[in-house]
């Protein structure tokens, strides 16, 4: 299992860079067509504005936010992902609002955003430097919404196969109670919740910026 997880770590590193062109297709296939629904679940209810998406990928969520005329911006560490997201926005008649940057060093002033969003982030999400930057750039009582994973639960054959693959490759697992501790310690009040869709269950974390440095789990 460790060998498999090591291989997947290398694969995902290329998936976000040299293989970024294949991201949307692969995501749709492995999720059995549910990927967009999982990503968009982070917008219910509509977040306050202005909004920053951290690790925006190919820009699907930014495109939806722009379609809703939301005041939104995006950052991603991958040059390839930034290029793809910018092209997608412009192709659909929207201004490009993406910046290449790491979550650990956001190029924005203090309390710039009312909401931060991240869907299916990699390990950076629990880096104390990332959470410190999230706390710095969020307004008082602002929300950092995170969708860390989804579970495929449909009864169909392909859903069952995909669900099994998600489990054996570690793409889905029950989050331990301590998973959100680094987020709480960064100064957020954390609430975990499930979003039930027709063929899957999405795990969603709502982290509200606390005025003090030690948060708590709600």
Which residue stretches match the model-derived regions?
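A short SAM/SAH-binding and catalytic strip from SAM-dependent methyltransferases
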Residues: 115-128
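Conserved beta-strand signature within the Rossmann-like core of class I S-adenosyl-L-methionine
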Residues: 142-148
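A short glycine-rich, Lys/Arg-flanked "PGG" loop and its adjoining helix->strand segment in the class I
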Residues: 129-140
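Conserved class I S-adenosyl-L-methionine
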Residues: 1-46, 60, 159-166
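Core SAM-dependent methyltransferase catalytic element
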Residues: 188, 192-218
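Short alpha-helix
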Residues: 171-187
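Class I SAM-dependent methyltransferase SAM/SAH-binding core
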Residues: 52-105
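A short acidic, Gly/Pro-enriched loop at the edge of an enzyme's catalytic core
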Residues: 104-115
């Amino acid at each position: 299992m460790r060998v498999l997880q090591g291989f997947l770590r290398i694969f995902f590193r290329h998936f976000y860079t040299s293989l970024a062109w294949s991201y949307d297709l692969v995501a749709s296939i492995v999720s059995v067509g549910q990927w967009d629904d999982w990503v968009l679940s982070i917008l219910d209810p509509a977040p306050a504005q202005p909004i920053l998406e951290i690790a925006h990928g190919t820009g699907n969520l930014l495109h939806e936010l722009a379609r809703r005329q939301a005041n939104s911006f995006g950052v991603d560490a991958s040059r390839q992902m930034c290029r793809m997201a910018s092209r997608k926005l412009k192709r659909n008649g929207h201004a490009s609002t993406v910046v290449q940057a790491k979550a650990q060093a956001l190029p924005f002033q203090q309390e710039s955003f009312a909401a931060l969003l991240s869907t299916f982030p990699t390990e950076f999400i629990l880096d104390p430097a990332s959470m410190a930057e999230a706390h710095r750039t969020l307004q008082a009582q602002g929300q950092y919404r995170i969708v860390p994973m989804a579970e495929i639960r449909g009864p169909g054959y392909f859903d069952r196969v995909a669900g099994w693959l998600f489990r054996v490759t570690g793409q889905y697992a029950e989050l331990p109670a301590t998973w959100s501790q680094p987020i709480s310690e960064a100064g957020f009040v954390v609430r975990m919740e499930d979003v039930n869709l027709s063929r899957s269950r999405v795990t969603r974390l709502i982290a509200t910026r606390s005025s003090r440095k030690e948060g708590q789990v709600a």
